[in-house]
Amino acid sequence: MTLDSRYGGEVYGGSKVVKRMEKYRPQNAPKNRQRKLLLPLSYGISSSTLLHILNLQLERQISSGLGRRAYDIHVLNIGTCEQSDSHRLGLFREAYPLHTYTQVPLHSIFKHDTTIKDVISEYGGPEFADDPSKTDQERLDIFRLSLSTATARADIDGILLTRLVVAIAKEQDCDGILWGDSDTRLASKALSNVAKGRGFSVPWDVCDGMSPWGIQFNFPMRDLFKFELSTYASLALPKSLNVVDSERPSVDNLSNKNMSIEDLLAHYVETQGQKYPGVMANIVRTINKLQPQSADTDHKCMLCGMPVDYSGEDPAIIGGQGSSQYTLQDWRERPVAGTLCYGCARTRLDLVPPRSVSS
């Protein structure tokens, strides 16, 4: 459907999102407390549009005399660099004053996720012993720069981001997390996870429901394509927010060493999705039909938190219990005591000692 007018665009886009939020209707709200949902904001089109649509919904509830909102929204922005963009977050706070806001850098994961220090040390091996004399930014940089490929860095960044979002959501006593992933984003994420050996965890990364982290994951934008959201944002969002599409590395040179699997598949899905939207939509719909095994298990990956498949597709320990032909052997003989899924074990092979990393 083409969003060819402001009214039509808002009705079309907003109704699909609101429908996905039906479980949080006022009629279903607990009577003894106010529900709170965390919304990670990247300043991109998808998460910004999600905030805009839900803000409109809550404003309508307030003006209709319901007595209270169905839920509160806590907006979280995670900066990827040392210098935070507090001015930009202030623009969103001014445009949508109903909500509370928090901004933290990625390296604050050492503060909010109390187990990550030991996890990184175990995952990295003896070369990655934690140095308390270094700042959190330096500790994170050493670990990230020790990943020798763009795909490995993007993979670990995504895991750390999820862990930090979950940790803050629990600190804020949130009932769930509202991810702003569009259908386009979910399709590319599913394909890249399969390519990286994380196919077993795809249902938890793409589908609504209880996550292995013990908190609800919701994807209200899952029925909208990226190009639809771009049109909606250009019509509906306040111009002062200056929301623009995030730029990815050029794919003109497919051998570009700075290009990750995520970048390549995101470009493929976005370009092909405009030509064949039904095909890309079927990726997410098919995954949504999968029935993941119970996340309530003691066998979880120590890094990504996903349940480990003991049927043979995932090695429980590198070179250990995994009986599959795909079990990985780390030629550096760096044993790990914790449990790793196949995807994290494979990414671990791209780690190099810090002394070999050139800044």
From Swiss-Prot:
Its main location: cytoplasm. Pathway: tRNA modification; 5-methoxycarbonylmethyl-2-thiouridine-tRNA biosynthesis. InterPro entries: CTU2, Rossmann-like_a/b/a_fold. It is found in: Cytoplasm. SUPFAM superfamilies: Adenine nucleotide alpha hydrolases-like. One of its GO terms (molecular function) is nucleotidyltransferase activity. Keywords: Cytoplasm, tRNA processing. Disulfide bonds: none annotated. Pfam families: CTU2 (PF10288). GO terms for biological process: protein urmylation; tRNA thio-modification; tRNA wobble position uridine thiolation; tRNA wobble uridine modification. GO terms for cellular component: cytosol. Plays a central role in 2-thiolation of mcm(5)S(2)U at tRNA wobble positions of tRNA(Lys), tRNA(Glu) and tRNA(Gln). May act by forming a heterodimer with NCS6 that ligates sulfur from thiocarboxylated URM1 onto the uridine of tRNAs at wobble position. Prior mcm(5) tRNA modification by the elongator complex is required for 2-thiolation. May also be involved in protein urmylation. Belongs to the CTU2/NCS2 family. This is Cytoplasmic tRNA 2-thiolation protein 2. It comes from Ajellomyces capsulatus (strain NAm1 / WU24). The gene is NCS2.
